[in-house]
Structure formats: structure tokens, C-alpha cells
Amino acid sequence: MAHYNFKKITVVPSAKDFIDLTLSKTQRKTPTVIHKHYQIHRIRHFYMRKVKFTQQNYHDRLSQILTDFPKLDDIHPFYADLMNILYDKDHYKLALGQINIAKNLVDNVAKDYVRLMKYGDSLYRCKQLKRAALGRMCTVIKRQKQSLEYLEQVRQHLSRLPTIDPNTRTLLLCGYPNVGKSSFINKVTRADVDVQPYAFTTKSLFVGHMDYKYLRWQVVDTPGILDHPLEDRNTIEMQAITALAHLRAAVLYVMDLSEQCGHGLREQLELFQNIRPLFINKPLIVVANKCDVKRIAELSEDDQKIFTDLQSEGFPVIETSTLTEEGVIKVKTEACDRLLAHRVETKMKGNKVNEVLNRLHLAIPTRRDDKERPPFIPEGVVARRKRMETEESRKKRERDLELEMGDDYILDLQKYWDLMNLSEKHDKIPEIWEGHNIADYIDPAIMKKLEELEKEEELRTAAGEYDSVSESEDEEMLEIRQLAKQIREKKKLKILESKEKNTQGPRMPRTAKKVQRTVLEKEMRSLGVDMDDKDDAHYAVQARRSRSITRKRKREDSAPPSSVARSGSCSRTPRDVSGLRDVKMVKKAKTMMKNAQKKMNRLGKKGEADRHVFDMKPKHLLSGKRKAGKKDRR
């Protein structure tokens, strides 16, 4: 099926936008910093890359344009002729040809300047070669200004064309302007074509879709056609001629019985005879429209003879009225049936059908005598069929039960389960429990094993295996157990005391704590230590012991005094109050010190989760190049 979608063609930029886009992309996607003290091969590569990158961008965009636009020789003749009428085939091909030439010129310019750049001996010379190469490429594109603008207009118009499938089932409406073609398509499809009481309201092709016999149909509304030579017809009329020539459709030739369109029945008949060659090998129906104003029976004899002659030639004439919808469905049905029959007949005449038919052979046996041999059906089968026709089925289905019980019905599929024990049908045992398959843990002989275990236990109980009394423990073991019990109770008390304190600050180590003598003696007694001889204990002896008597210093001769008189030394002023004149100033200094310590205290409680790494290099300030007028950012 030839199906074309011209809405996917990419936008064709103007020459100025084309150049700006490409050069901007080159500046963004290639390095921008080079210095003259770099090695010459690095400088050459820097500018070669810019030239090649620009050439590749031009090449890709131009190739995309050439690929997206349809080739007139490859598409369906209907679209080829329609594009020739709307856009002029020669102009269209010239524009695409110029784009193709521009693409080749850009490639050649890049190739030449890359070759010259290999011999550049300085940064300045390589830069000038790059500048010349990009300039020549832009000049080539600038000369394609008119071609690019023309192709953009063609693209916009193509995207607005209706999607017409030339090979599907189609009904085609044609006739003089203002005879009711657009009103008919609005009635049979969901199209919304503008209808006005003047000629040439429809200036292009319109498509509507409908369903008939579960098939999809398209109805094409063509602009009105006037009766004059083909060379004198304008673009609007030629669209209708193109559709008639190329679309394999059922043609509905619409005539105005009331002659309100401004053309008599004779003129409409002459137009019919003029375009009759376009109706060859197509089902044709003459639609006599506006029968609500005037019917065929009310016409003069000469006008009635027009429709009589058409019917005698094999063209059905159907009276319709799009205002009252009389005959509209009849026309639709007749046209669709004729087109379906015509398509089947055409396929039967084709080679493809003959190839299939040649492979098929219908074997018909020849009669050997005149004796009748009807098919044999056993009497039991015949009787069963009669019972099935008269009697109801014995087994009730779930649907029958649902209808009988109504709201009380509950779907129960477990009653059909085929189990060994029928009472287990409704046991609620899951198939999967906590990721384990229940079937893996079910032993079919589990009840038998349980009975064996119960018998074994009864035998053991009868033998008195469980009647033996445990041996009495000795005194040493009882003391150990009692001591262990006291230790466990002591641990529990310690835990409770610790919970009551609930200290959250730093804890002082046990060796640094001051131990009171009474507390120590109490703890030792609770642990079972005999404290009767506590006065001779080590800690009591150490407490009573006085300081060792030092050896008396030998008296020395007095030296003559270095000074006549010396006043007694005074104590040094504390640092936290030195330099402060009064109490008020001391309080103020302490307040300032406390406020300064707040931040440090907060950071002191900071954990690993409170860490934050600040962005020391914000990209929006440090990315890009420092151009003129941008240096105040950093």
C-alpha cells in the first residue's frame, strides 16, 4: 500500500539562518583556544578540524533536505502529477538540483583548503586559510537563498495536503461547482468541508473516511470543473482532473436538477461527455442532487431524456437530497457494492490469481451407475439429535446456576476438583507460603508416621523411661548456682541504674573517678567479700599513712642582702579580667566570648551526615569564553 506522509519533512531554514546555525555550531562544538607558540602540526590540526566540521554540518543538512523531499520519479503518479500542478515539476527539480550542486561545492571547497592548510607554516596563515574556506562555503549557501525559500514553501504546502491512499477503496465526487459535492461528503463521512452558496468554495482536495461492511473507505471531494479545453483549466480544476485520472475509485458524477448552480442540465451533460474518457474501467454513478427542489419527473421531456439515455448506457441514476438526506445512503451502498465487485473482477483477471488457480484442482468423482447412495447416519445419533433439540441439557452450567440463583450465586470452582477425599475440596491451604511451595513439604504418609511415633512413645512411657529422678546436686554446685544468680541480679540492677541516669554527655573513666570508702565497702559486701577485718585492708592502711619525714637541711651562713628592703610579692591578675576596668566591662566581655563560642559549639555537634561540600566553581559563572563586556562576572 502506497502511503505517504509529507508532514515528516524537516524544516528548511533560510540562507541566513542556515549560515548562522552552522557557524554557531562550529564555534560551540570545536576547540577555541590556540597559541602561536604551539607546534605547527597542532595549529594545522586545530584549523583543519574547524573546516572539516563546518563542511560536515553543511553536508548533513543539505543531504537531509534532499532525502526528505519526495522524488517525483519514485512516488505514485497521482502525487507526481499533483505536485507538478501545484509546484511546477521543472522548478521543483531545479531547486533540488541546485541544493545538490551546493552540497558538492561545499565538499570540494573543504577538500581544497584542507590540502592547502597542510602547508601552512604559521598560525596566521592557517587562520586565514580557515577564514577563506568558511567564507566560500557561506557564499555558496547564500546563493541558494531563493531555492531554500521555495523548498520551504513547498514543504509547508505538502504538510497541509490531505493524506490520500491511491490504492485503497475510494469514492470520488466530481461535477460542476456548487452542485452539492461538499454537502454529500459531510453527510456520509466525518469530514467538515466548508459549504457556501457560491461557486469554487472548495479549492483543493478534501478527504473523509467512513466504514462499510467492516471495511475502511475514503471519500475524496474534488473542486468543481468547468467545461472548457484542458489547456484552459486552472490549477484548482486540474487537481480534480488528476484525481480522476489516477485514483482507482468509484466515480460519483453529481448533477444539479434545480440548475441553481448556474449551469443547465445540457451543460452538465456536455461536461460529462468531455471528461468521460477519465471514467474508463471505473464504476460510475450519476447522482441527481437537490431532488427536494425539483425531481426528474417534474422536468421537461428533453431533460428527462438526458437521464433516460444515461440509464440506457448502463449508468445508474439516483435521486438524492443532501438537505433531507433522501437517497444518500442508497448512493453510498450502490457505489461501494459496485466498487467491491469491480475490484474482485479486476483481481480475477490478473496474473496473480491465475497463478493461484493453476495450483488448485477440484476433483469431482464420476458416477458409476444410477443407484442413489445417501450418507449413512446411525439411528442412535439421529435419536440423540432429536433429544438435544427437544430436551434440555442434563448438566447445568455455571451460567444457568447464576440465572437461577440471582444475587445469591457465588462462583465456586473448587467443587469440580477431583480429590481422593472429597471433604478436602474447600480446605484453605495456600499453594505458596512465604516463598515456599507447600507441596514440597507435604508427606503423603505423614499420618502413618504419626501413628508409629505415638505407639513408640506409649511403649517408652510404659517402660518407665521418663520416671527416673534427676540426681541431687552436691553443695559446691548449689553454691555456684546461687552465686551465679546473684551476679545476674547485680547485672540487671546495674543496667537499671544506667538507664535511670541516662547520661548523654562525655563519661569519665573509672580510674579517674573519686571512689568513696563507704561505697566501696558496700559493693564488696554485696559481692560476698568478708569486710570484718577492713581496718587492716590495703586501702585503709594507705589512707592512715602520713608523709615520709624528709632529712633536715643543714644550716648555711647567711649571705649579705642584695637589697636593703623588698616588699612582699603579690599574686598575678587572672587573664580573663586583665585589661578590664570594672565589673560591667567584665560581664560584657564574657557575653561577647559566649556569642563567639556559639558557632564553634554548633560545629562541635556536627556529624558525618551534616557534611556539605560547597560548589567552589559554579558552572554558570566559569563556563564559556571571556568576551568583551563579560569580564565583570569573575
Swiss-Prot record:
Gene3D superfamilies: 1.20.120.1190, P-loop containing nucleotide triphosphate hydrolases. Associates with pre-60S ribosomal particles. Interacts with MINAS-60 (product of an alternative open reading frame of RBM10). Residues 544-554, 586-604, 619-634 have a biased composition (Basic residues). GO terms for cellular component: cytoplasm; cytosol; membrane; nuclear membrane; nucleolus; nucleoplasm; nucleus; perinuclear region of cytoplasm. Residues 495-517, 529-634 are annotated as: Disordered. It is found in: Nucleus, Nucleolus. The modification N6-acetyllysine is found at residues 103, 522. One of its GO terms (biological process) is negative regulation of cell-cell adhesion. Belongs to the TRAFAC class OBG-HflX-like GTPase superfamily. OBG GTPase family. NOG subfamily. GO terms for molecular function: GTP binding; GTPase activity; preribosome binding; RNA binding. There is a cross-link at residues 103, 332, 534 (Glycyl lysine isopeptide (Lys-Gly) (interchain with G-Cter in SUMO2)). It comes from the Eukaryota. GTP binds at residues 175-182, 221-225, 289-292. It holds the Pfam family NOGCT. The modification N-acetylalanine is found at residue 2. Residues 169-340 form the OBG-type G domain. InterPro entries: G_OBG (IPR031167), GTP-bd (IPR006073), NOG1 (IPR024926), NOG1_N (IPR041623), NOG1_Rossman_fold_dom (IPR010674), NOG_C (IPR012973), P-loop_NTPase (IPR027417), Small_GTP-bd (IPR005225). Its main location: nucleus. The keyword Acetylation applies. Involved in the biogenesis of the 60S ribosomal subunit. Acts as a TP53 repressor, preventing TP53 stabilization and cell cycle arrest. PANTHER family: NUCLEOLAR GTP-BINDING PROTEIN 1. This is GTP-binding protein 4. Residues 560-572 have a biased composition (Polar residues). Residues 573-585, 605-618 have a biased composition (Basic and acidic residues).
